[in-house]
Amino acid sequence: MKIIPLASESLGVRSLALFLRIGKVGILIDPGVALGPKRYSLPPAQAEMKALAVAREKIQEYAKKAQIVTISHYHYDHHTPFFEGLYESSSIEKAKEIYTGKILLIKHPQENINHSQRKRAQEFLKNAREIAREISSADSKTFDFGEFIIEFSPPVPHGREGSKLGYVVMTLVDDGKTRIVHASDSQLINDRAIDWIIEKNPDILIAGGPPTYLSYRVGNVREVGIKNINRIIAETNAKLVIDHHVVRDKNYENFFQELDKTPQTFAEFLGVKSAPLEAYRKELHKLEKGEDVELPKGIQKFLKGLPP
């Protein structure tokens, strides 16, 4: 199994998009990307817009290599919608390129879903039905493709139990040699998600960590996240790749240091330093104005690699 992270906060955008290659088959997991429209009361900086364009191009590139596409839920940083979106770098043409002729394994569009995501799912399916090879609701199901299986969890909360953000499904891919779980936006802060991950005992766990940058609004997610992740560490031998929400916090590395085993971000999995642009949006706006700012080395290097 070849594992290729495509986009995430450590790569400058909101996403947890992943590509897997098993033999001749490509699997594209959560093919969406977005920017937070407001952070520190500021819109995305120019560097973030450039990073968004780079991430979008990468998702489109790997969509061409995929026969199977999975969608854990209907937030725009996890699927590409059929509309022109500035902060999603989306369009009807880009969506068609991703989904045409593909086997789509998707979160159930009507069950265990909140009002917002139900509307988004309906809009998605209205367009996808015309172009996809096949569409199946994935919740709690296992799909056998011969060389590998793809198994989906029951719906789990998007974050804490009772979250108003609805539900997500987690994805297990097993080719007989490697078991990888993509835990999406479970955020590792609800027991249902943790129990399922431990039961599946993956070799690699890819997950969005808790939204510690929102602790003032969502409570003690830091402590809950540390307890739950340490439980996964104690009860499995999984390699941890944790990114997404937690990397929107400037101090995410301090969170990692409190764990019994240090995770990698997507960037680190790829062998480069993390570049959490959103967390440093204030500094990026100052940089645009010609002011002197201090930025982590990972961001400095990332900025040099962006297109002009």
Swiss-Prot record:
PANTHER family: UPF0173 METAL-DEPENDENT HYDROLASE MJ1163-RELATED, UPF0282 PROTEIN MJ1629. Belongs to the UPF0282 family. This is UPF0282 protein PYRAB09800. It comes from Pyrococcus abyssi (strain GE5 / Orsay).
